[in-house]
Amino acid sequence: MRISIKGILDIAWYLVVFIMLQVLATYLVSILSLLHNGMDFGTALHYLQSHRVFSSTTVIATSAVSSVLTIVLFMSLKWTPVARSYVRSKPWAALFWVVLLSLGTIIPSAWLLEQMEVEVPSGLERMLNALMGNRWGYLSVGILVPIAEETVFRGAVLRTLLQLFRGRTAWLSIILSALIFGLAHFNMAQLPHAFLMGLLLGWMYVRTNSIVPGIVLHWVNNSTIFMVYNLIPSSANGNLVDIFGGSQQAVWMSLLFSLCIMLPALFQLSRRLKKAEPVA
């Protein structure tokens, strides 16, 4: 029983630290921004009690700083164990199918979100526009955030859940970690996509005991969304039918095409995702 309680407390602590690092990064970047604009330290602290510094630069810097702090802290404290064994196994074919799987999930996920008619909070929309509308935002959205989130939610949270429910089906741990991952986004607009992605990411972690496939899937997903946002500006506020020029038939065809990518990718990954062989 003591081990179970310790595991639960460990997971709670990981989540608290993850949130605290985001808050710390927000205040740190905001204060530095105000100091850079000529405000003294005391006045900056007082200003932040009732105001929020919001600009493309501060949003990007905050996201990048919190991600770097998260990666460094979790790995240095070994909350997320780091090993090169999976990469040394040269799983390039499996990672190729991970890329295809990620591409195949984007349109179905967007369609599902449309059917739920969940409104994106204005604050979240402003933050996403700030991140997506600046080329430097890709450093955070496309690279650092995938590594940080996989480090926390698969490398630490799911790993601990698997230990906590050892002897039971791994899917219990995968579902719980996916739910935690979805709720950690703190809004209903992102929860469905995050939960479904969490199931895939968790499944890949269990099959490989590595966060590398998850980072690749997460990277492709975020990179594709970033690219579409900048190449098709109407995608920011429009539905799929708007993106496809008002053709509902094109939407159905894109969904079918996505499934033709996603399902074979899942089949291939069910055969190819394996734990690295132990080094003799």
Give the residues covered by each predicted segment.
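Hydrophobic alpha-helical transmembrane segments
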Residues: 8-16, 60, 95-99, 135, ...
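Functionally important transmembrane alpha-helices
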Residues: 19, 23-31, 190-247
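C-terminal membrane module of polytopic membrane proteins
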Residues: 50, 219-280
